[in-house]
Amino acid sequence: MAATGEALTPQGYIQHHLTNLSVGEGFWTWHIDSLLFSVGLGVLFLWIFRSVGKKATTGVPGKLQCFVEMIVEFVDNSVKETFHGRNALIAPLALTIFVWVFMMNFMDMVPVDWLPHTAAMLGVPYLKVVPTTDLNITFSLALGVFLLIIYYSIKVKGVSGFVKELTLQPFNHWAMIPVNLLLESVTLIAKPISLALRLFGNLYAGELIFILIALMYGANWLIASLGVTLQLGWLIFHILVITLQAFIFMMLTIVYLSMAHEDH
C-alpha cells in the first residue's frame, strides 16, 4: 500500500513496487534505496570475508569458512581457466563482482511486500530493495568494468598499440581505418551496455513476476492457492537465475579484461 494508507489498484500496486525512493530531479536524481542496499551489501560482503580470513585455521574449518573457501576456490579456478595474462588483481576483482552481484540479486528472494510495507509504516513512501533492478546500479558496475578495459588496454599495449587495435583491425589496411574504427568502437562500447542490460533485464523481469504473483493473493482462495504454488516454483527457478547472472557478469568481466591484456 502507499504511504497514505489508501488501497492500491493492481496497476498502482505494480507501479509502487517498481518505484525507487528518490531525491533530486532529472539527471541529478539519486535513488537512495538502491544506493543504501548496494553499499550495505558490499560492506556486508567485505566484513564476512575479512572476518573469515582473520579467523581461518589450518585445522578443521567451520561451516562458514568452508563455504567461503569453496567460493574463493571456484572463482580462482574460473580466473585461471579464462584469464591468460598476469595480474594479481583479477581474481579479487572477480570474487568481488561475483559475490556482490549475487548478494544484490538475492534481495529478490525477500517477499515483495515485507520491506516496502515496513518502510511505509515508518513513513517511507517507496522502497525498491533489489539494486540490480535499477539501471543506474547495473550501468555503474558495467562502467567500472569498461574503465578497467580501457586502462589495461593502454597499460599493456601502450597508447599507440591501443589506437592501432581500434584502427587496423579487422582489416589491416590504411584505407579501411574509418571502417575499422567504427566497427571496433561499436564492439568496445557494446561490452558495458550488454553487461548492464543483461543483468538489469533478467532481474527486473524476475522482480516483476514476483509482484504479479503477489497480486494473486488478493483474489479468491482458489487463485491465492495457485499463487502459492507459482511463487514456490518461481522462487526455486529464480535462485538459479540470480546465481547464473552473477556468474555471467563475472565471467564476461574476466574475458574482457583478458582480451585487454592480449598484446597483438
Swiss-Prot record:
GO terms for molecular function: proton-transporting ATP synthase activity, rotational mechanism. GO terms for biological process: proton motive force-driven plasma membrane ATP synthesis. It is a multi-pass membrane protein. InterPro entries: ATP_syn_F0_a_bact/chloroplast, ATP_synth_F0_asu, ATP_synth_F0_asu_AS, F0_ATP_A_sf. One of its GO terms (cellular component) is plasma membrane. Keywords: ATP synthesis, Cell inner membrane, Cell membrane, CF(0), Hydrogen ion transport, Ion transport, Membrane, Transmembrane, Transmembrane helix, Transport. The keyword Cell inner membrane applies. PROSITE patterns: ATPASE_A (PS00449). It is found in: Cell inner membrane. It comes from the Bacteria. The chain crosses the membrane at residues 29-49, 87-107, 134-154, 177-197, 208-228, 235-255. Belongs to the ATPase A chain family. F-type ATPases have 2 components, CF(1) - the catalytic core - and CF(0) - the membrane proton channel. CF(1) has five subunits: alpha(3), beta(3), gamma(1), delta(1), epsilon(1). CF(0) has three main subunits: a(1), b(2) and c(9-12). The alpha and beta chains form an alternating ring which encloses part of the gamma chain. CF(1) is attached to CF(0) by a central stalk formed by the gamma and epsilon chains, while a peripheral stalk is formed by the delta and b chains. Key component of the proton channel; it plays a direct role in the translocation of protons across the membrane. This is ATP synthase subunit a.
